[in-house]
Amino acid sequence: MFTLKKSLLLLFFLGTINLSLCEQERDADEEERRDDDEMDVEVEKRFLPLFLPKIICAITKKC
């Protein structure tokens, strides 16, 4: 009975450590994805002001 309790306690402990490591990796992956998304937004912000006047000029033909 005592060895069974030790084995179960060891499995629970190792499972808890494994779960916490997986959560840390998942959090790190999510942070990397957020960085890429933020970079895309910055590129879009820089792209739009450069070409918006040219697009409006081409549509209205008032240059």
UniProtKB/Swiss-Prot annotation:
Disulfide bonds join 57-63. Expressed by the skin glands. Belongs to the frog skin active peptide (FSAP) family. Brevinin subfamily. It holds the Pfam family FSAP_sig_propep. This is Jingdongin-1-MT1. Residues 1-22 form the signal peptide. Residues 23-44 form a propeptide. It is found in: Secreted. The lineage of its organism: Eukaryota, Metazoa, Chordata, Craniata, Vertebrata. Its main location: secreted. It comes from Amolops mantzorum (Sichuan torrent frog). InterPro entries: Antimicrobial_frog_1, Frog_antimicrobial_propeptide.
